[in-house]
C-alpha cells in the first residue's frame, strides 16, 4: 500500500479555501469537485496502457495508446462522496459508477451497507473509491471488503483529507489499497472529527445537517 499526499500548489490552495470558516455550500461543493479532479489525475497516472491501431485524421493507420482492459468504476460513498463525483468524471466520463451507502450499527458500531449498486463486472475493473474524508477508516474498510467480496482486485481511494488513525487502520486490513489525499491531517478528536479537517463535508456539500 502507498499513501500519496498530493502537494501540488493548486491542490493545496483549493484545500486551504475549503478549510475557511463560513465557506458557502456552493463554494465548498465546487472546490470539492475541483480537488477531486486533480486527485484523479494523480491516481490514474499508473494505469496500464496498450498500443492500438486506429485511422488518423487523414484516414491513414497510426498507433496510439489507450487504457487497457475494462478500465475504471468510480465508487462514491454516500452521501458526501457524491460531491467529488463530477470532478472525477470530467477526466474519465465513460467510467461506470458504483454507489455504496453505509450506516453504523448502534450496537456493534460497525459499518453496515444499506445501499449497494456495484457494476456487475467489477472484478475486471479498477475501483476508485471517492469520499471527502478518511477519518477512522471504518467506512473505507467496509467498502473495500464489499468490493473484494465481489471479486475486485485493484482498488484505490481518493480523499480530500485523511487522519493518521484511519490510514493506519486501512493499512493493517488492506495493505494492497493505494490512498491518494490532498492532506494527511494531525489527528482525530474525541468525537471522531479530523483536525484541522474540514468539518462535516456532507453537510457543507449539500447544505443540510
Curated annotation (Swiss-Prot):
Gene3D superfamilies (UniProt xref): 3.40.50.2020
Keyword annotations from UniProtKB, A to Z: Allosteric enzyme, Glycosyltransferase, GTP-binding, Magnesium, Nucleotide-binding, Transferase
Enzyme Commission code: 2.4.2.9
Database matches in SUPFAM superfamilies: PRTase-like
GO molecular function: GTP binding; magnesium ion binding; uracil phosphoribosyltransferase activity
Co-factor note (free text): Binds 1 Mg(2+) ion per subunit. The magnesium is bound as Mg-PRPP.
Cofactor(s) in the UniProt record: Mg(2+)
Binding site for uracil: 194, 199-201
Pathway it works in: Pyrimidine metabolism; UMP biosynthesis via salvage pathway; UMP from uracil: step 1/1
InterPro entries: PRibTrfase_dom, PRTase-like, Upp_B, UPRTase/APRTase, Ura_phspho_trans
Regulation: Allosterically activated by GTP.
A Gene Ontology BP annotation from the UniProt entry: uracil salvage
The UniProt record lists the keyword Magnesium: yes
Catalytic reactions of this protein: UMP + diphosphate = 5-phospho-alpha-D-ribose 1-diphosphate + uracil
Binding residues for 5-phospho-alpha-D-ribose 1-diphosphate: 79, 104, 131-139, 200
One Pfam family of this chain: UPRTase
Assigned protein family: Belongs to the UPRTase family.
Biological role: Catalyzes the conversion of uracil and 5-phospho-alpha-D-ribose 1-diphosphate (PRPP) to UMP and diphosphate.
PANTHER family found in the cross-reference section: ADENINE PHOSPHORIBOSYLTRANSFERASE, URACIL PHOSPHORIBOSYLTRANSFERASE, CHLOROPLASTIC
The protein, known as: Uracil phosphoribosyltransferase
Organism in which the protein naturally occurs: Pseudoalteromonas atlantica (strain T6c / ATCC BAA-1087)
Amino acid at each position: 500500500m502507498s499513501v500519496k499526499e498530493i502537494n501540488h500548489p493548486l491542490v493545496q490552495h483549493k484545500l486551504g479555501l475549503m478549510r475557511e470558516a463560513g465557506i458557502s455550500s456552493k463554494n465548498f461543493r465546487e472546490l470539492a469537485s475541483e480537488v477531486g479532479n486533480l486527485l484523479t489525475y494523480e491516481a490514474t497516472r499508473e494505469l496500464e496502457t496498450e498500443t492500438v491501431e486506429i485511422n488518423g485524421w487523414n484516414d491513414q493507420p497510426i498507433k496510439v495508446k489507450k487504457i487497457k482492459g475494462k478500465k475504471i468504476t468510480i465508487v462514491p460513498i454516500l452521501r458526501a462522496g457524491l460531491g467529488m463525483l463530477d470532478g472525477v468524471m470530467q477526466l474519465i466520463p465513460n467510467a461506470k459508477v458504483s454507489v455504496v451507502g453505509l450506516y453504523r450499527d448502534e450496537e456493534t458500531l460497525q459499518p453496515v451497507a444499506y445501499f449497494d449498486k456495484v457494476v456487475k463486472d467489477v472484478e475486471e475493473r479498477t475501483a476508485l473509491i471517492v469520499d471527502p474524508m478518511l477519518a477512522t477508516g471504518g467506512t473505507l474498510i467496509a467498502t473495500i471488503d464489499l468490493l473484494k467480496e465481489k471479486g475486485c482486485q485493484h482498488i484505490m481511494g481518493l480523499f480530500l483529507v485523511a487522519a493518521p488513525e484511519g490510514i493506519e487502520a486501512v493499512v493493517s486490513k488492506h495493505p494492497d489499497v493505494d490512498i491518494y489525499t490532498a492532506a494527511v491531517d494531525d489527528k482525530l478528536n474525541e468525537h471522531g472529527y479530523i483536525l484541522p479537517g474540514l468539518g462535516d463535508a456532507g453537510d457543507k456539500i449539500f447544505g443540510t445537517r
